[in-house]
Structure formats: C-alpha cells, structure tokens
Amino acid sequence: MDISELTEELRKQAGRNVRLGYKVKFVLDDGLIFWDGTGDKPEIGNDDKGDADTTITMTAENLEKLIQGGLDPTLAYMTGKLRVEGKMGVALKLTSMFAD
C-alpha cells in the first residue's frame, strides 16, 4: 500500500472504533499520516498538524502489516520495527483498535 491507501485504511479503522481522544503522528519512510482524534469526528490526513501526543515511526510496509493484523505491535516495538515517542498508552490504545 502507498501512503494514500494507508491513510484511507486508517480512516476506515477510525470510523469503526471509539473516539481516540489524542493526536497521533505516523512518520513513515515516504511521508506522514496525522490522526487527530480529539474531536467528535477523527481527522486523518497527510499534513503535519504540529505536535502530537504520540509519534510512531515505522515503514509503510510495517504499518500495513500492523493494520491488517500481520505484525504484533509489541514484537515490532521490541525488535525496533517501530519507535514510539510520547505517550505509550496512546500507541497501545491504537493497536487494540486495529485488533477489533
């Protein structure tokens, strides 16, 4: 998946799940995805909206695997396939949303 397809997939995930309540920035190898989950309706796009509560850095390929359930988030973190800066609890909440 390219970054636009990943962005759309995250929009679908956000629409199926409860409000996140935080801002998350995914920094990928070919761009970024910013998820603002602080409002009534999540806003997800490719513009950098500034500071996020949590920044997750990984490859686009690994984000695709994570969304589709083919990558265990804990193992990915422990093996360096993803890095988390900021609130770790937000990252954990996101991964539980992907599992639903």
Locate predicted features.
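Feature captures hydrophobic
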Residues: M1-D100
